From Swiss-Prot:
Single GO MF descriptor: xanthine phosphoribosyltransferase activity
Phylogenetic lineage: Bacteria, Pseudomonadati, Pseudomonadota, Gammaproteobacteria, Vibrionales
Function of the protein: Purine salvage pathway enzyme that catalyzes the transfer of the ribosyl-5-phosphate group from 5-phospho-alpha-D-ribose 1-diphosphate (PRPP) to the N9 position of the 6-oxopurines guanine and xanthine to form the corresponding ribonucleotides GMP (guanosine 5'-monophosphate) and XMP (xanthosine 5'-monophosphate), with the release of PPi. To a lesser extent, also acts on hypoxanthine.
Binding annotation for GMP: R69, D92, S93, G94, D95, T96, W134, I135
Record-linked Gene3D superfamilies: 3.40.50.2020
Complex and partners: Homotetramer.
Pathway membership: Purine metabolism; GMP biosynthesis via salvage pathway; GMP from guanine: step 1/1; Purine metabolism; XMP biosynthesis via salvage pathway; XMP from xanthine: step 1/1
Full protein name: Xanthine-guanine phosphoribosyltransferase
Organism per entry: Vibrio vulnificus (strain YJ016)
Reaction catalysis annotation: GMP + diphosphate = guanine + 5-phospho-alpha-D-ribose 1-diphosphate; XMP + diphosphate = xanthine + 5-phospho-alpha-D-ribose 1-diphosphate; IMP + diphosphate = hypoxanthine + 5-phospho-alpha-D-ribose 1-diphosphate
Residues annotated for Mg(2+) binding in this entry: D89
Enzyme category, top tier: transferase
Biological-process GO terms, alphabetical: GMP salvage; IMP salvage; purine ribonucleoside salvage; XMP salvage
Membrane topology note: Peripheral membrane protein
Amino acid sequence: MSNKFVITWDAMQTYCRQLAEKQMPADQWKGIWAVSRGGLVPGAILARELGIRYVDTICISSYDHDHQRDMTVLKAPEGDGEGYLIVEDLVDSGDTARKLREMYPKAKLIAVCAKPSGKELLDDYVVDIAQDTWIEQPWDMALAYAEPVNRKQK
């Protein structure tokens, strides 16, 4: 992908709070199902913001860091999803979202970020991302010392 969009921890917190505001009133939700692994951090932040104590995971494997591959459902809660928020960090091609809709037709599917190919599958999201953009999530990055410019020229 030719473009990158970097999300800092502060930005992720802000985006998740914005997403949480759209899910009010909180007492309408039985719980949160976070899609592992990308939805784990946003799911935890939403659980905190909404005061939701019941958090479970849906484990679907479709990426090896930056390469999409065949989708495998590793763990899935029972039911049709009624009363649950399914939380993702990103909807990209929409393949995972389509699978989630098939598995849980009555759940509310939300994500922090959405690309054009998948955003119509979501009930809510907060950040539009161009299709040709790779997202660097804060949990995939590390802070590092940067040499001052004047020292690089010696």
